Each structure stands twice: as C-alpha cells, then as structure tokens.
A protein has these predicted regions:
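Residues at the C-termini of beta-strands that transition into short coil/loop
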Residues: 24, 90-92, 109
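Short, glycine/charged-enriched secondary-structure capping and boundary segments
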Residues: 57, 82-83, 102-104
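Loop/turn positions that initiate beta-strands
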Residues: 63-64
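Ligand-binding loop in jelly-roll beta-barrel domains
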Residues: 71-99
Length: 126
C-alpha cells in the first residue's frame, strides 16, 4: 500500500516567548503603560479592564483578548467593582498573517480560554 503525504504549512511561527503571566489585580489597579518591539496579548479571565492604545480606548470583559502589535503603546486599568484577572503573553512573531491581529479584539470560546489556561499552567511549571 502506498502512502501519500500532505505537506504542512506553518502560518504562524513564534520565535521567542518573553512573558507568560496570570495576574490577579486589585479593583483599583492602574498601569501607566509600555511599548516594546514584540507582540503581546491581554486576555480578561474575570472582571473587566480598560486598555488604552496609541489610537483607541477599549473595555474588555471576561473572555475577550486584545492583541498589541510591536511598538504599540498600551496600558491597563481595572474597571468596575470586580478585581480583574488577566493573562498576559508576549512573544516575537514575524509571520505576515499576524497582521490579522492588529487592533483586534476577539471573544474566546471556552475551549480557547482553556488552551490559554494550559499555556499559563505550563509556564508556571518552569
């Protein structure tokens, strides 16, 4: 029996991880902001947070994630009475299809949220 292979294409290749964190912030938390030459995403696991970028201000709720492209200013402020829990992952990626994520807020499914949880759990084990 002859086997036929299927070539795989790698659309997104993450070259380096810089941070993988899970923060449990206070309800009055404020971070003045930063900019750096790599990608970052912030995913709200509980509560709500306001994120200011170079161009806009967004309010993210549970299950939403925002991507920050390299050199984009971003800060973070807790919103509401519930202290927010936020996963922050920063990484280097030069794949052209990352353009899709620029200035993008996505609402994650439970499966996607669980995958981020597994990334956090693995990072904590190191």
């Amino acid at each position: 029996m002859a086997y036929e292979s299927i070539p795989l294409t790698e659309e997104i290749h993450i070259d380096k991880l810089y941070t993988v964190h899970y923060f449990e912030y206070r309800s009055d938390f404020y971070y003045a902001g930063e900019r750096h030459n790599f990608w970052e995403f912030q995913c709200v696991d509980k509560g709500s947070a306001k994120v200011q970028t170079d161009d806009d201000v967004y309010v993210l709720n549970r299950g939403q994630v925002i991507f920050h492209q390299p050199n984009e200013f971003h800060n973070l402020t807790a919103v509401g009475q519930t202290a927010p829990n936020i996963a922050v992952v920063s990484f280097e990626c030069c794949s052209p299809c990352m353009d899709f994520f620029k200035k993008r807020i996505l609402t994650l499914s439970d499966t996607e949220r669980n995958l981020i949880g597994m990334i956090i759990a693995e990072a904590v084990s190191y």
